[in-house]
Every structure is written in C-alpha cells, then in structure tokens.
Amino acid sequence: MSFSRLYRLLKPALLCGALAAPGLASTMCASRDDWRCARSMHEFSAKDIDGRMVNLDKYRGHVCIVTNVASQUGKTDVNYTQLVDLHARYAECGLRILAFPCNQFGRQEPGSNAEIKEFAAGYNVKFDLFSKICVNGDDAHPLWKWMKVQPKGRGMLGNAIKWNFTKFLIDKNGCVVKRYGPMEEPLVIEKDLPCYL
C-alpha cells in the first residue's frame, strides 16, 4: 500500500483525534473541511469585525447566543435593540453574544466590515461582532455548518438558515441547546437563560 493511499485512509482518524493529541485534535477538527469532527463550538475560530482571528475557546464557561445579523432587514431594529438589552442585563452573569453579519438573505448586509461596525455602534453594541460570512452553502463558515446539524440545532423544513437573525443558544460546554427562527425575537431566549447561566 502506498503512503498516499494509507494517508487518505487514516486522515479522518488523525483529524478527529483518534490518533492525535487532544489539543491538536481540537484545533484541527474545526477546519473548513473537517467541521463534522467538532464536539463543541469551542473547537472553532472566526475573524472578528476587525479581521483578527478569534479562537472560540475563549467562550468556554459562558452561555452564548450566536446569530446572523443584517443592517437592512425589517427585523434589524428589534433584534439589535433586544440583543443589546440582553447583553446589558446578562453579561455579568456570563452571557456572551456572537453576531455574524451575512449578506445571503435579500442582500441586506451589503456593507464592508468597517461599515457594519459603524452601523452597530449606532445601537451601542458591546457584544462581539465578527466579519461577514456565509451561513449556507459550500462557502458557509464551518461553525455554522456544524451548528445546523447538531441534534438541537436542526431547523424546521430542513437545516438551512432561512433568514437573517436565526439564533442558536449555546451552553457553557459549547453545545447547541436550542435554535430560534428568524421570526422569534431575542427576548424569547430570556426564558431559557436561567437553565444554562
């Protein structure tokens, strides 16, 4: 058996940590191609709104709301307003909010990262904003691919994100515990927070 054939056969096991060191496995599993191996959100990384790579392991021990945002959607005002409110009231209790701009729905997030950051500043956003990404399709960010297939992250009528402001509640261990549709306002999540904070 050639080395390249052997490598192809063993690559999934190596990448998922069956043969690799635990620290190395958690870094490798969250790559663009091997997101299925991840066991928690903490195994991923993403660029923040300023283009700096952020290891999502920094959210270990925190309850997180992860959402796709857009600045020109009919649901923008209510979502930004309520997310800012939730963050203000629960950040000291350990809540973190991760907002990922996305232009896939009605092209309602057309601006640059700098323009998105300026827009969010108008709402006095203090939660974490990330660089613009795709949430559906082959180019979707690996975190979003992973969240959509988790047992409690699956959607109605298929797992694809249907519109702006789909929200995922993530527990302190980095596991998806609930998915909220785009028509559900952020304050709906508040009733579920005491179980996880």
UniProtKB/Swiss-Prot annotation:
Query: Out of the domains of life, which is the source?
Result: Eukaryota
Q: Which PROSITE patterns match?
A: GLUTATHIONE_PEROXID_1, GLUTATHIONE_PEROXID_2, GLUTATHIONE_PEROXID_3
Q: Which InterPro entries match?
A: Glutathione_peroxidase, GPX_AS, GPX_CS, Thioredoxin-like_sf
Q: Give the GO cellular component terms, alphabetically.
A: cytosol; mitochondrion; nuclear envelope; nucleus; protein-containing complex
Annotated active site:
73
What's its top-level EC category? oxidoreductase
Q: What is this protein called?
A: Phospholipid hydroperoxide glutathione peroxidase
Q: Which organism is it from?
A: Bos taurus (Bovine)
Q: Which gene encodes it?
A: GPX4
